[in-house]
């Protein structure tokens, strides 16, 4: 291409890091650097965790790379805030120029946190013709800052973007970290824009404390309605290799990282108990008769109350009953509700008291437990006539993507034959023939997206 038949051969760098240098240059020829950021943890070649300073770069390398960036900027008479990006060889300490981003980067807050310099303000001052108010020797670095990018995407499905409505989004529960958000509760996440919901930044005197602080902040926030990479980020930040600074660009490929929150048996018990009693109290308060009765009222003859909950793969039937002294007995635990309203429940389970914020959207529940958000679905006690899709029905039981079409127009099938396979909620669902017949018309295509109850086949007997 370009009328040039020369071939460029680049050296293969087995263990590499993405290191970038923040610079400021004014129209008077003054250029300084504000140290490095490491942005090596990436998926699909896009950054998800950035930090400053890098755990790999020592003061000598910082000065060497910083001066290389300053020299380049002075050569082109650069005038603005900018980022000079380098490829760094983790084994040899060599580095190579990649590009200059002539703007503030998404990750610029980590530099602000460790230098105390407002980069947005400095960029505006430079643009209006002001001279830099400091020289290189004035720049110092304090502590460690880490930023995580919170995306509406599914790490368990190749980080594909997700859509939906944010039924819950409350970051006030995690005020110890900085949230730069572009969404609120009720925001509709679509496909027209980048799926980043927020960037979350922590600062601490040292790197391990900054990582732990950021992980806990992500964990404490209350959000749901759209699949995010939150648990994946938490898993990265708590990973031993990450904490040891082994963060080369192959980090995600070589480490075993959680894509979904895995609940212990005790955590599952606590979450299901809190949800069941919150639902019981909510239903009781809305009842015109029981809403006026004492909370511990019972006629002594009522059977155990039951509610079925689905937690990702775990289906739990919670059995509970009212006991004396305003206590509840739930699956062997003694529980007391200290306060309960539509926003959440203050509950004590086996002498362990905590408050859990609760959001309900249809049959979906998001409960903010001491160990983080837990998502569950309330399963119906009885299948409502007319609303269920019989097994083998020819309509889609849920929204999803067609990943396999087993038949075509004119195909003869027997009852029970698989016609279409749909992928939804990261599981495969087969639509089967309810009786023998011949396919009259194929109404969907491979890889097409279909909506719930959308027809997939017409056929004749």
Language-model region placement:
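Catalytic cores of soluble metabolic enzymes centered on carboxylation/carboxyl-transfer
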Residues: 69, 109-329, 334, 448
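A long amphipathic alpha-helix within ATP-dependent nucleotide-binding catalytic cores
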Residues: 2, 6, 51-89
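A structural signal for short beta-strand/turn segments enriched in small hydrophobics and glycine
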Residues: 210, 410-419, 424, 447-453
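Conserved metal-phosphate-binding beta-hairpin within the catalytic cores
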Residues: 10-13, 19-25, 78-105
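Short histidine-centered loop motifs in beta-beta connectors
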Residues: 391, 395-397, 403-412, 435, ...
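Long, charged amphipathic helices and adjacent flexible linkers at domain junctions
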Residues: 134-142, 372-396
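Single conserved hydrophobic/aromatic residue that forms the stacking wall/gate
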Residues: 451, 455-461
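ATP-dependent carboxylate/phosphate-activation module, predominantly the ATP-grasp catalytic core
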Residues: 25-67, 104-119
């Amino acid at each position: 291409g370009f009328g040039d038949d020369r071939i460029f051969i680049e050296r293969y760098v087995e263990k590499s890091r993405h290191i970038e240098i923040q610079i400021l240059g004014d129209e008077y020829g003054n250029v300084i650097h504000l140290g490095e950021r490491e942005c090596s943890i990436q998926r699909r070649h896009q950054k998800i965790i950035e930090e400053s300073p890098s755990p790999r770069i020592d003061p000598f390398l910082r000065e060497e790379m910083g001066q290389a960036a300053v020299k380049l900027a002075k050569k082109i008479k650069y005038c603005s805030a900018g980022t000079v990006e380098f490829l760094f060889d983790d084994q040899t300490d060599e580095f190579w120029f990649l590009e200059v981003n002539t703007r503030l980067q998404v990750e610029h807050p980590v530099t602000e946190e460790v230098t105390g310099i407002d980069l947005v303000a400095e960029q505006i001052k430079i643009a209006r013709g002001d001279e830099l108010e400091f020289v290189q020797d004035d720049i110092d670095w304090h502590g460690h800052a880490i930023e995580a990018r919170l995306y509406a995407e599914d790490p368990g499905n190749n980080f594909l973007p997700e859509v939906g409505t944010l039924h819950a989004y409350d970051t006030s529960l995690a005020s110890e970290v900085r949230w730069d958000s572009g969404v609120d509760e009720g925001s509709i996440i679509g496909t027209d824009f980048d799926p980043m919901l927020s960037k979350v930044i922590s600062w601490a005197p040292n790197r391990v404390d900054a990582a732990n602080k950021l992980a806990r902040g992500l964990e404490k926030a209350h959000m749901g309605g759209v699949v995010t990479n939150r648990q994946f980020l938490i898993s990265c930040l708590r990973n031993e290799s990450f904490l040891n600074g082994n963060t080369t660009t192959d980090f995600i490929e070589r480490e075993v990282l959680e894509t979904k929150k895995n609940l212990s048996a005790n955590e599952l018990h606590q979450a299901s108990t809190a949800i069941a009693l919150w639902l019981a109290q909510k239903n009781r308060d809305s009842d015109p008769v029981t809403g006026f009765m004492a909370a511990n009222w019972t006629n002594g003859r009522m059977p155990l109350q039951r509610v079925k909950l689905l937690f990702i793969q775990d289906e739990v039937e919670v059995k509970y009953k009212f006991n004396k002294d305003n206590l509840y007995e739930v699956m062997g635990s003694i529980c007391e509700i200290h306060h309960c309203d539509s926003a959440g429940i203050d509950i004590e389970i086996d002498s362990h008291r905590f408050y859990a914020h609760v959001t309900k959207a249809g049959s979906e529940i998001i409960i903010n437990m001491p160990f983080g958000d837990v998502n569950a679905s309330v399963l119906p006690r009885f299948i409502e006539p007319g609303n269920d899709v019989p097994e083998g029905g020819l309509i889609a039981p849920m929204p999803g993507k067609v990943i396999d079409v087993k038949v075509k127009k004119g195909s003869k099938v027997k009852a029970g034959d698989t016609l279409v396979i749909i992928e939804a909620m990261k599981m495969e669902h087969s639509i089967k023939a309810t009786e023998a017949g011949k396919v009259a018309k194929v109404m969907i295509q491979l890889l097409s997206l279909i909506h719930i109850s959308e027809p997939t086949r017409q056929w004749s007997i």
